[in-house]
């Protein structure tokens, strides 16, 4: 009951997405099961202390969960107990003195502009409805830096061809306008022409399946993974790699960090600044290519 109350709070008061709420629900259900297994079937948050939480962390590590996954679960649990404290259900947050496992934060993967241009200009896309749509999915993710959840949430009314911009809904239902260039506009018009001709049940959603239903995040992931597999030696193939590539390309070509932050829909510069590390790695590569830099 308490977990349900917390999830409703996230949904109706914090405007969290269904995807995020699902992640919280999964983490908290897992913790609740652990508590019941070790407390004779009783789940009483008021009886949970720091040592018990630490024992849960050990059990998660024993299950070979990555430090990143463990820390995400701890974050969910910490938010849950903050909620309980505000409601006066518990007097203290047992996670206040608990530290998660240390993690190495890797630099974002990104794809070189030349590799993506070769992919998009190549013949790896069919000329039917799905081929035209899939090409636009790749192009739009890379050209705008939007999230896949934002892409599938675009409605036809959100696209303004005259103003060359589209409205997307990001995390916590925050809306922002994203500009698009002439080339992307032409691809969008070509897609809608094929879609409206071949998909009878196409409704309010901009990106649809053959049956007219809205695309899912899973379908977008599979589209991107399949198409990016044509780029050799690519360590990671996901929609977020295209978002990383957009940000890295913008910064490498002189865009201001604040402007990239707004385009990505980040709430703070801290989230965007990770891409400056990637561009600095590029600068180091350029520097080391200099003859003088190669001398011992």
Predicted features along the sequence, with ranges:
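Conserved catalytic core of the tyrosine transesterase superfamily
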Residues: 1-296
């Amino acid at each position: 009951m308490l977990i349900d109350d917390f999830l409703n709070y996230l949904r109706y008061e914090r405007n969290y997405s269904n995807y995020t709420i699902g992640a919280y629900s999964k983490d908290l259900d897992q913790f609740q099961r652990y508590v019941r297994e070790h407390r004779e079937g009783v789940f009483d948050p008021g009886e949970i202390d720091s040592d018990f939480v630490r024992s849960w962390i050990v059990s998660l590590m024993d299950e070979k969960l990555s430090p990143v996954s463990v820390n995400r679960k701890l974050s969910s649990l910490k938010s849950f107990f903050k909620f309980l404290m505000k409601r006066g259900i518990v007097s203290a947050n047992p996670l206040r003195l608990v530290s998660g496992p240390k993690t190495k934060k890797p630099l974002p993967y990104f794809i070189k502009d030349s590799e993506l241009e070769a992919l998009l200009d190549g013949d790896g896309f069919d000329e039917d409805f799905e081929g035209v749509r899939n090409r636009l999915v790749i192009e739009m993710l890379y050209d705008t830096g939007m999230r896949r959840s934002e892409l599938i949430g675009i409605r036809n009314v959100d696209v303004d061809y005259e103003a060359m911009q589209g409205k997307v809904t990001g995390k916590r239902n925050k809306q922002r306008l994203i500009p698009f260039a002439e080339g992307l506009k032409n691809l969008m018009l070509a897609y809608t022409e094929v879609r409206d001709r071949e998909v009878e049940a196409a409704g309010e959603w901009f990106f649809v399946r053959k049956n007219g239903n809205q695309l899912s995040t899973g379908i977008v992931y599979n589209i991107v993974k399949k198409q990016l597999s044509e780029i050799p030696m690519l360590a990671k193939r996901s929609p977020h790699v295209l978002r990383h590539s957009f940000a890295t390309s913008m910064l490498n070509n002189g865009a201001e960090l604040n402007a990239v932050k707004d385009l990505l829909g980040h709430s703070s510069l801290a989230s965007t600044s990770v891409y400056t590390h990637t561009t600095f790695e590029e600068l180091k590569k350029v520097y080391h290519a200099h003859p003088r830099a190669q001398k011992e």
